[in-house]
A protein has these predicted regions:
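Short glycine/proline- and aromatic-enriched beta-strand/turn motifs that initiate or cap beta-hairpins
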Residues: 19-75, 156, 226, 254
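Hydrophobic, lipid-facing positions within transmembrane beta-strands of outer-membrane proteins
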Residues: 34-36, 66-72, 131-137, 203-207, ...
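Repeated loop/turn-to-beta-strand initiation elements of outer-membrane beta-barrel proteins
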Residues: 81-84, 146-149, 215-221
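Bacterial Sec-dependent N-terminal signal peptides
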Residues: 1-23, 39, 147, 251-255
Length: 255
């Protein structure tokens, strides 16, 4: 029993010492112009075709999914207003869209899994998902004790992702717009899977702001837009370039 009590006392003493050391480190960092934040929030958006191709005749379905992100930030303030914000973020991106298209170039899995390229006219549905680790860096401007604006760049690495879908209620021209026609009524569909073609790297810009609601708690909003499409330039199956564009919001804890 004595050994258990002694062990508990040692553990409590160690915890208190570690807490005190952490508090001292944070105070020392604050004295040198450093701030720290832990963020968590949701993102809503999708992969937008830029420019909008004439083959897309209308969007009939859109599901932004539940995209979660968490981020740690360190801010270095050089004067009362200007600073530099660096971070490390884990994020999810995704969406489901359905559209009516005409002569849309793609590849479909026909027959016993054979992939055939051609042009599709009818309904097409796409399901995109990606998980990435991101390094953002931004310039920050402190408006007052409550508000902060920031804008900058980010680079990300996708470690998991998929891009799948199906077509139905239309017809497929094999090889070219005048190739052999294969009809797909509303009760029949063909699938596609381009997951293995997704780019690993992403770079883009972000702009947003935060507001201190309480002493340690803030709310924030941010627009993130990628400069790079989700497929590399060598991927010729889809002639349209798709760029991730997301609006993000959430809460953060300010140390």
């Amino acid at each position: 029993m004595k050994q258990i009590l002694l062990s508990l006392l040692c553990l409590l003493s160690f915890t208190a010492t570690a807490q005190e050391a952490r508090d001292k480190n944070i105070l020392a960092a604050l004295r040198h112009g450093w701030n720290f934040e832990l963020r968590a929030g949701l993102s809503m958006g999708g992969t937008a075709p830029i420019p909008m191709p004439r083959e897309i005749r209308g969007v009939e379905k859109y599901n932004p999914k539940l995209n979660v992100h968490v981020e740690g930030q360190a801010s270095k303030w050089f004067d009362p207003h200007w600073g530099l914000v660096m971070g490390l973020r884990m994020e999810q991106k995704g969406m489901v869209t359905g559209a009516r298209v005409k002569n849309y170039h793609t590849s479909l899995l026909l027959g016993e899994g054979a992939e055939v390229s051609g042009n599709w006219t009818g309904y097409v549905e796409s399901n995109y998902a990606a998980s990435s680790i991101v390094l953002p860096i931004s310039a920050a401007y402190k408006v007052n004790d409550h508000g902060k604006l920031q804008a900058g760049l980010y680079a990300g690495y996708r470690f998991d992702g998929s891009f799948t879908g199906h077509v139905t209620d239309g017809h497929f021209r094999m090889g070219s717009p005048v190739g052999e026609r294969v009809d797909f009524p509303a009760d029949k569909q063909a699938t596609y899977d381009f997951s293995g073609e997704l780019s690993r790297f992403e770079a883009g810009m972000q702009v947003g702001g935060s507001w201190r609601a309480y002493r340690h708690f803030l709310v924030y909003g941010e627009l993130r837009a990628s400069f790079t499409p989700i497929f590399p330039g060598s991927f010729a199956t889809l002639t349209t370039k798709l760029y991730p564009i997301y609006v993000c919001t959430g809460f953060s804890y300010h140390f």
